[in-house]
UniProtKB/Swiss-Prot annotation:
<dbReference type="GO" id="GO:0003677">
    <property type="term" value="F:DNA binding"/>
</dbReference>
<protein>
    <recommendedName>
        <fullName>Putative transition state regulator Abh</fullName>
    </recommendedName>
</protein>
<dbReference type="InterPro" id="IPR037914">
    <property type="entry name" value="SpoVT-AbrB_sf"/>
</dbReference>
<dbReference type="InterPro" id="IPR040678">
    <property type="entry name" value="AbrB_C"/>
</dbReference>
<dbReference type="Pfam" id="PF04014">
    <property type="entry name" value="MazE_antitoxin"/>
</dbReference>
<keyword id="KW-0805">Transcription regulation</keyword>
<dbReference type="InterPro" id="IPR007159">
    <property type="entry name" value="SpoVT-AbrB_dom"/>
</dbReference>
<keyword id="KW-0804">Transcription</keyword>
<comment type="similarity">
    <text>To B.subtilis AbrB and SpoVT.</text>
</comment>
<keyword id="KW-0238">DNA-binding</keyword>
<dbReference type="Pfam" id="PF18277">
    <property type="entry name" value="AbrB_C"/>
</dbReference>
<dbReference type="InterPro" id="IPR052731">
    <property type="entry name" value="B_subtilis_Trans_State_Reg"/>
</dbReference>
<feature type="domain" description="SpoVT-AbrB">
    <location>
        <begin position="5"/>
        <end position="50"/>
    </location>
</feature>
Length: 92
């Protein structure tokens, strides 16, 4: 684990502010959900990504399929978009 040298106080409602530079680096936008994990005395925050969401379109449908031993989920539309991008890249 890497320290980024930032310390924040917890306010009276139990909130902390995540620095904008950190949010940008981790692609965390306003209204994004954050997952909390506990590992011993550590609290780990992770951007929440629901299971089954298409990597290309963000869609969650019953038609989504997993590829690469479950590492990539694509909707039919997302699979088509990815295929077109790969084909275009191979032509270059």
């Amino acid at each position: 684990m890497k320290s980024i040298g930032v310390v924040r106080k917890v306010d009276e409602l139990g909130r902390i502010v995540m620095p904008i530079e950190l949010r940008r680096a981790l692609d965390i936008a306003i209204k994004d959900s954050i997952e909390f994990f506990v590992d011993g005395d550590k609290i780990i925050l992770k951007k929440y990504k629901p299971h089954g969401v298409c990597l290309m379109t963000g869609e969650i449908t019953s038609e989504n399929k997993e590829y690469g031993n479950g590492k990539i989920t694509l909707s039919p539309e997302g699979a088509q978009l990815l295929l077109e991008e790969i084909q275009a890249a191979l032509k270059e």
